[in-house]
Amino acid sequence: MRQPSVTSFRVRPAEAGDCPEILHLIKELAACENMLDAVKLTSKGKVTVGLAMYYFTYDPWIGKLLYLEDFYVIQAYRGLGIGAEMLKRLSQIAIRSQCNCMHFPVVTWNQASIDYTHRGALDLSSEEGWHLFRFNREELMDMAGEK
Amino acid sequence: MAFVMIREAKEGDCGNILRLIRELAEYEKLSDQVKISEEALRADGFGETPFYHCLVAEILSAPGEPQGPCVVGYGLYYFSYSTWKGRNIYLEDIYVKPEYRGQGIGSKIIKKVAEVALDKGCSQLRLAVLDWNKRAMDLYKALGAQDLTEAEGWHCFRFEGEAMRELAGK
């Protein structure tokens, strides 16, 4: 696979106008496919090649946390330090916002999960036994409907 | 049986909530991890930008009894976001004092959170359970929840303290 030449990249906060691009990347991440064909390269234009979607959560034992919901770089642009730069910016945001840690979910068949542990992350599910549970809308309606 | 009411917590409940937070940590065998203060709970839950919301389960004493209402459980939650489904609610903590269990108070708290979720246009409620807490797992499964760690292999990872500062500094 020919890697596109990247002279420079920057990581910046998203704006409202980025939403169509963000949705596009979200779908890519969900599909985990190589979507190189869909990327329009121009010699002068800017291309959005990655996203990190986060919000603040709360742990009653330690306080505010930064939760990284989605983290993705288009496959053709990996290995260039873009993901690492995004993680660096996120950590800076977390520290500036008085967060004690960053949490993020990983599907354990994802090889990148091993990278995270090498960078110092802890797998809470393996270490402490936490399981993530989900109720969907139908179950919410069942629960709310019963009195 | 005493009447139990599930209501929104007020700032004045923070002392009681912290007491119950410590009890829950003790139950989860992780009590040395509780670092939070009552002051932080007040500021973070009842300041200009709330970082969490909380429901409390309150037992109302019968007429003639000397003691006032008593907080015997809580559910602490916040709003989150799924890039696939949109608005979510995350139930971070749910706890009922041991002597008040078996009366459906925990279920009442979860149902109230479900009502809030629907009211705010959320499509999912998520929560985490420790793998040895079979009683809690059984309750959530009976209410229709799916164990995503078991079914889909989702694990929760954390960067904390030194690891996070290193990431920020590089």
Swiss-Prot record, chain B:
Keywords: Acetylation, Acyltransferase, Cytoplasm, Transferase. The modification N6-acetyllysine is found at residue 29. It is found in: Cytoplasm. One of its GO terms (molecular function) is N-acetyltransferase activity. It is an enzyme of class 2 (transferase). Signal peptide: none annotated. It catalyses: S-(2-aminoethyl)-L-cysteine + acetyl-CoA = S-(2-acetamidoethyl)-L-cysteine + CoA + H(+); an alkane-alpha,omega-diamine + acetyl-CoA = an N-acetylalkane-alpha,omega-diamine + CoA + H(+). Coiled coil: none annotated. The keyword Cytoplasm applies. Substrate binds at residues 27-28, 92, 152. The keyword Cytoplasm applies. Homodimer. Catalyzes the N-acetylation of the amino acid thialysine (S-(2-aminoethyl)-L-cysteine), a L-lysine analog with the 4-methylene group substituted with a sulfur. May also catalyze acetylation of polyamines, such as norspermidine, spermidine or spermine. However, ability to acetylate polyamines is weak, suggesting that it does not act as a diamine acetyltransferase in vivo. Belongs to the acetyltransferase family. This is Thialysine N-epsilon-acetyltransferase. It comes from Bos taurus. The gene is SAT2.
